[in-house]
């Protein structure tokens, strides 16, 4: 399975090498704008596990960038970490509405599904990540581990 993915990607890269090397950096976001100071502040707060304060900054960031899937993903993450699953579900859905292939939102939404004991839905997100991440990605690996942990009775660390 991995060989086929590797082969397909290799052929694609060879055929489109001029386009690939001029494409620039990749991001989960569909937004090429520079990240706002409010967004950057929110990231720092999230890293410090100050989720309520991060939500305030993320809402500030939405004022000027309401179509940024990364902002909605972090809003979902912050609400999930605060135990506000309905709010988290809304924000993950919004992130995926903007960018259906947002790896972070698919992973974190999958983690939320596991918290809600909806293993089947988490596995659906894992399948989506498997299709998006041709040669694998950390989001796939983390969600897969969390699903395995959930099935064996362990608590996820994500």
PLM region descriptions:
Residues 24-35, 123-158:
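Terminal, low-structured helical/coil segments at or just beyond the last alpha-helical repeat
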Residues 33-64:
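Alpha-helical segment of the N-proximal tetratricopeptide repeat
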Residues 64, 98, 131-135:
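Structural marker of alpha-solenoid helical repeat scaffolds
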Residues 68, 102, 136-137:
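Residue-level recognition of tetratricopeptide repeat
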Residues 74, 108, 142-146:
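Canonical tetratricopeptide repeat
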